[in-house]
């Protein structure tokens, strides 16, 4: 599994809840492609913290690059939508073609890898981000309010999928 976040604490919450999932190792092509996309203050890492300085395009380009990688089987995307560089409010979404929610839905359907999204909204501010979550939900993207919950659910889904696909029923019980 790999992770893309724009806040370090979300990265930590997700990492603390990996469960049986293992952190991916980027192949050289993925590492190099990300290095070209990222500013020098961001370290290329499978638990990628874009910082609040990432806009819609950088987020989407990193998601695409990671989903294209043969060494990544699943992805968790964590978004703290308060960043001024992201178009995440209802008003911004209405005015912006190619906003992040739309891009995420398209990318997930293109690459078809297990992916979950956490949209961490501070209490009292959630209403201005309703449309963002609605677009993800209506696009079939599993969406959660916290990174830890998203990672727990991704872990359960991947384990279920492997168990069902490989018919390891005994493994499910362990």
Question: Where are the regions that the model predicts?
Answer:
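Peripheral docking tails and interdomain loops at the edges
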Residues: 1-4, 9, 15-23, 92-174
């Amino acid at each position: 599994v790999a992770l893309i976040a724009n806040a370090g604490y979300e990265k930590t919450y997700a990492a603390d809840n990996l469960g049986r999932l293992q952190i991916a190792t980027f192949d050289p092509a993925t590492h190099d492609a990300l290095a070209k996309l990222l500013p020098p203050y961001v370290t290329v890492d499978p638990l990628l913290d874009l910082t609040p300085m990432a806009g819609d395009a950088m987020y989407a380009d990193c998601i695409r690059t990671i989903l294209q990688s043969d060494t990544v089987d699943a992805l968790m995307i964590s978004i703290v939508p308060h960043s001024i560089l992201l178009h995440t409010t209802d008003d911004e979404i209405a005015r912006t073609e190619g906003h992040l929610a739309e891009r995420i839905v398209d990318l997930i359907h293109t690459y078809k890898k297990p992916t979950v999204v956490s949209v961490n909204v501070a209490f009292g501010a959630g209403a201005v981000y309703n449309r963002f979550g609605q677009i993800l939900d209506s696009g079939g993207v599993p969406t959660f309010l916290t990174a830890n919950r998203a990672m727990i659910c991704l872990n359960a889904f991947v384990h279920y999928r492997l168990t069902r696909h490989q018919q390891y029923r005994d493994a499910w019980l362990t």
